[in-house]
Amino acid sequence: MNIAVLVSGSGSILEAILAAGIEVSLVVSDRPCRGLDIAGDANIEACLLSRSVYGGFSKDFDRVAYSDALTGLLDVRAIDLVAMAGFGTVLSGEIFNRYAGRILNTHPALLPAYPGWHAVEDALADGARVTGTTVHIATQVMDAGPIVAQAEVTIEAGDTVASLHERIKQVERVLYPQTISQVAQVLALGGSIEGSITPGQQG
């Protein structure tokens, strides 16, 4: 089972995945980051697929061309499962057909509540009492793919965005590796994520 992890930042989720004993074949980042260093230290192939070649972070960013380039990287390495781990680029195009049902993402809320980049802020602003983390299948529509697993996090009085996000991350670092392992087992047996894993509350 060849697993690729997509990162953009500190690599804390990647560290949790590796600490869980999951074998990772490839780590890809859209920018220079600590996640690539973690991969290198673990003797995992690390690849910088920089956004700068495709328009950077401007309105001219060619999302489809970038996604196609990433698809090529995955194809040539015969990747079976992709885990987005704090990856900061929204993908588009053929990659979701090529790897349909085989791209996982983790989100800091109990989807379908609070999709998007500001999930933690939105939950606090809404006065929610409970939020959490969701592992879902990534699709063309951001944060709208089938839910694979969820775990709740209680919002405490006096919580800030930083304090709540940190507690969500603590739960995420347990739930995501568990889910990746479960999904990998299903795929290795020739199954598919949808219909094989029952979404549920965990943790």
Regions found by a protein language model. Give the residues of each.
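One-carbon transfer enzymes
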Residues: 1-203
